[in-house]
């Protein structure tokens, strides 16, 4: 899968990410991956559900992967951050 099929979810409004997914799906891409970490996980789930229920009804959730990533801070301390990867496919 090419890197351009991945949408990284951050702090922007949900509809910005929905528009990105819908634009990719309408341009002929059959699978889009949503990736988020930490507090943005709930926003990624919202994006997937809005795309499925309001915009493109034939999109299915192919898989959901959850993981924990270890982030090293500026002072050398490490903290664990949850991550999610949602695969949407037509």
From Swiss-Prot:
Molecular-function annotations in GO: double-stranded DNA binding; RNA binding
Protein name: DNA/RNA-binding protein Alba
Signal peptide range in chain numbering: none
GO cellular component, one term: cytoplasm
Function: Binds double-stranded DNA tightly but without sequence specificity. Involved in DNA compaction.
This protein's UniProt keywords: Chromosome, Cytoplasm, DNA condensation, DNA-binding
Main location: cytoplasm
Originating species: Methanosphaera stadtmanae (strain ATCC 43021 / DSM 3091 / JCM 11832 / MCB-3)
Tagged with keyword DNA-binding: yes
InterPro entries per the UniProt record, alphabetical: Alba-like_dom_sf (IPR036882), DNA/RNA-bd_Alba (IPR013795), DNA/RNA-bd_Alba-like (IPR002775)
UniProt KW Cell inner membrane keyword: no
Entry's localization field: Cytoplasm; Chromosome
Any one Gene Ontology BP term: chromosome condensation
Family of the protein in this entry: Belongs to the histone-like Alba family.
Domain of life per record: Archaea
Entries under Pfam families matching the protein: Alba
């Amino acid at each position: 899968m090419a890197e351009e099929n991945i949408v990284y979810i951050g702090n922007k409004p949900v509809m910005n990410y929905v528009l990105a997914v819908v634009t990719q799906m309408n341009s002929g891409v059959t699978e889009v991956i949503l990736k988020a970490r930490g507090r943005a996980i709930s926003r990624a789930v919202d994006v997937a559900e809005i795309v499925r229920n309001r915009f493109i009804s034939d999109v299915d959730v192919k898989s959901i992967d959850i993981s924990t990533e270890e982030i090293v801070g500026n002072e050398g301390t490490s903290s664990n951050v949850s991550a999610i990867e949602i695969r949407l496919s037509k």
